[in-house]
Amino acid sequence: MKLTQRLSLRVRLTLIFLILVSITWAISSFVAWRKTTDNVDELFDTQLMLFARRLSTLDLNEINAPQRMAHTPKKLKHGHIDDDALAFAIFSADGKMLLHDGDNGQDIPYRYRREGFDNGYLKDDNDLWRFLWLNSADGKYRIVVGQEWDYREDMALAIVAAQLTPWLIALPFMLLILLLLLHRELRPLKKLAQALRFRSPESETPLDAKGVPSEVRPLVEALNQLFSRIHSMMVRERRFTSDAAHELRSPLAALKVQTEVAQLSGDDPLSRDKALTQLHAGIDRATRLVDQLLTLSRLDSLNNLQDVAEISLEELLQSAVMDIYHPAQQANIDVRLQLNAHDVIRTGQPLLLSLLVRNLLDNAIRYSPQGSVVDVTLHARSFTVRDNGPGVAPEILTHIGERFYRPPGQSVTGSGLGLSIVRRIATLHGMTVSFGNAAEGGFEAVVSW
């Protein structure tokens, strides 16, 4: 098995072809041999019967002593006919030879048992013969006609060889044609292998499936899809690395500055405590940024959701509002939940949908002024998170949800990734997210399906 796996496809197909042809040729030869020998035996048995009946029509009463026909040279051949392959003799009822052909007939032993065909040997000879015994019309004489079995077999072999030899001669030409066809049909695969060998890892150009056999075309299409996914993943990774490096540069620089301030504060405890407080806040911001970067990276690598379940959005929103209640109270913001629909069920990943709702609520609380109200409303085909703040300028609204985008002049710290995470989770669940200014005032996010 290991040896055949190391062989090329062309060699394996050629070997299979040769094996199949050899088996077919052997079976055909065997069948042809059996059919030919049966036909030859039937033909020659018929000739022996006719010959014996001709002899029985002679006037055998004139035979008084053993006689023989005119002697002919041994094995006189006319074409492919051996004249000593056929012999006859006539015996009396008591086994006395009365007439023979002057050649092999005189060596036929008298072994009459009944009329019909029988096999036997000539005197002092090891070659098997086919004999036909026949009684004369008056029953006084025994006529025997014989033919050598080797002659029949040689005749059958000659007929079979004449039939199969052209096929045997044509076999090398068939093999040559097969090799040429295999070379032509496998040429697209060679080109495909060469294209893969010299393909750049960053290339997004699809493989050319022109001329590729239909059995291999699904493989080429699957490879093209794989290359497209790999290219998209590499683009995302590059963008993620670039964005992460850019966004982490500022917090890390701020941490370095606060560390230096703490070191330079000397014996001033107020300056040192202030610097350490700001350092702690900076570490929190950097930690939050790293967490969001890792979350977004994991979401980008997902194509299909795992561990999905049927989720009640009513329970999901209630749980999210309860979780955000204390941070909202500390910010002097009231969060209200209104259920305009019940028993709204969606299939999804529970943790991701919880993260989506939590990010929307966290964004609303972080950017709403104190004393604001955040309304969460569930409908049959959507849910809305809306605050009653000043809203967002139209020129800024078009950029909301982009990665690392933060409106200018913001006093609240953030990374600009929260709403990007929301949009990605919604996409994975077949939902759409829209951001805009509410008619009653304030900013709202609508998640619909």
From Swiss-Prot:
Single Gene Ontology BP annotation: phosphorelay signal transduction system
Periplasmic side: 34-161
Alphabetical list of Pfam families matching this protein: HATPase_c, HisKA
Domain Histidine kinase: 243-449
Any single GO CC term annotated in Swiss-Prot or TrEMBL for this entry: plasma membrane
InterPro entries attached to this UniProt entry: HAMP_dom, HATPase_C_sf, His_kinase_dom, HisK_dim/P_dom, HisK_dim/P_sf, Sig_transdc_His_kin-like_C, TCS_sensor_his_kinase
Entry-annotated residues carrying Phosphohistidine: 246
Principal subcellular localization: membrane
Membrane-spanning intervals of the chain: 13-33, 162-182
Highest taxon, organism lineage: Bacteria
Protein location: Cell inner membrane
EC number of this enzyme: 2.7.13.3
Record membrane topology: Multi-pass membrane protein
Record domain HAMP: where: 183-235
A GO molecular function held by the record: phosphorelay sensor kinase activity
Swiss-Prot/TrEMBL keywords: ATP-binding, Cell inner membrane, Cell membrane, Kinase, Membrane, Nucleotide-binding, Phosphoprotein, Transferase, Transmembrane, Transmembrane helix, Two-component regulatory system
Substrates-to-products reaction catalysed: ATP + protein L-histidine = ADP + protein N-phospho-L-histidine
Cytoplasmic side: 1-12, 183-449
NCBIfam families for the chain: PRK10337.1 (NF007664)
Physiological role: Member of a two-component regulatory system QseB/QseC. Activates the flagella regulon by activating transcription of FlhDC. May activate QseB by phosphorylation.
Protein name per UniProt: Sensor protein QseC
Native source species: Salmonella typhimurium (strain LT2 / SGSC1412 / ATCC 700720)
